[in-house]
């Protein structure tokens, strides 16, 4: 039946007149529709291939995608072709998708945000409680310097001042020296030296250098032993190193093994750290600043008390007598019983050339002294006629007399030092034999303090007797 219907339709179509052909527009519309479909297919072929995984699926999997920017660009391009209405639809679609993405959070993200919020809250509470604690009234065990000019009270101004002072003290704790007084009180007057001499170690008494062949080597400056030994009879010598204790202590022990010349050792840990430099603050020495003198090779070391300082150029390891030329001036200061060394140091315009300037002054004084003595001899005609004034009666310059007496004392002092060295060696040998093990500590075999003192006294007597025997043997050998 279907085939018969098709044949009848074809025959009827052939018999239609030309002026009645009104169905042709339908055929044309079909061809236009087919052409648009073909163009759409061509455009789809030219487009880039799209992935099966869309942005929603990637976001659920936890992958970060740059879909917002790319999508907005593609949609803006399509909107330009399609019209303003499509642009509005795309923008609204983007906003809606953005809201969905922002609202989509995993359980892990929610926990992280919750923990972060708790952390911020607890941090703020901790800061607030810390500020209130630092603003409290002064405690009885806090230093008076910290409480200076800020009384107790809970007014906002006083609380802020106390909080600020305590906050600043946290940082000054690491900048200030470890103790307010770096040295113990001076001994009583009969045993006290008139002045205190602070000496640097690096590039003043010793010089260290590194070479590829031998590594680190430390050289002792020529005349250091004589300088320390001679001035120790006039000064309380304090060695103040610019290096840390773990490096400089061994060098200091080599300079003075029995502590006969150097009274105290200070190191970089005892410096004041200020403005990026380490400063040797003489006011922390527990001594009268008018009787303290410092010799250093770094001007930053004495920047707080430049009126107490003598500057020397850093020693480069070559032989020189720069250190020994300071002895006459330092000896003059100590023997004149001055109450304040600062005016004398200030009388020298340049503290870098004090030895030369002092030598010129001494030469002028010596010439004046000789002229005065010559005038006295000329006036005494009777002694001149008898020839008494010309034979053995020429007076000596006072500074020369002081130097001669100092040399005698130095010789006697060095003899005592050599004897003490021998005695100290014997003491070290005896102390090395007397040891206690960890087993003795655990079992309680350690003697009481009274017994230890008794043992030490007995050992000391044995050392004294042994030392006297050695002296007798040396005397007998010397007489032979």
From Swiss-Prot:
Coiled-coil stretches: none
Entry's Gene Ontology cellular component terms: mitochondrial inner membrane
Segment annotated as transit peptide: 1-39
FCP1 homology domain residues: 190-333
UniProt-listed Gene3D superfamilies: HAD superfamily/HAD-like
Superkingdom of origin organism: Eukaryota
Stretches of the chain found on the membrane's Mitochondrial intermembrane side: 136-480
Pfam families documented for this protein: NIF
SUPFAM superfamilies: HAD-like
Residue intervals on the Mitochondrial matrix side: 40-118
Cellular compartment(s): Mitochondrion inner membrane
Primary location: mitochondrion
Keyword terms: Membrane, Mitochondrion, Mitochondrion inner membrane, Protein transport, Transit peptide, Translocation, Transmembrane, Transmembrane helix, Transport
Region of interest called Disordered, as start-end residue ranges on this chain: 63-107
Cross-referenced PROSITE patterns: FCP1 (PS50969)
Topology of this chain in the membrane: Single-pass membrane protein
Transmembrane regions: 119-135
Biological process annotations from GO: protein transport
Function: Essential component of the TIM23 complex, a complex that mediates the translocation of transit peptide-containing proteins across the mitochondrial inner membrane. Required to direct preproteins in transit and direct them to the channel protein TIM23, and possibly facilitates transfer of the translocating proteins from the TOM complex to the TIM23 complex.
Family of this protein: Belongs to the TIM50 family.
Assembly behavior: Component of the TIM23 complex, at least composed of TIM23, TIM17, TIM50 and TIM21. Interacts with preproteins in transit.
Protein name (database record): Mitochondrial import inner membrane translocase subunit TIM50
Protein species of origin: Kluyveromyces lactis (strain ATCC 8585 / CBS 2359 / DSM 70799 / NBRC 1267 / NRRL Y-1140 / WM37)
Organism placement in taxonomy: Eukaryota, Fungi, Dikarya, Ascomycota, Saccharomycotina
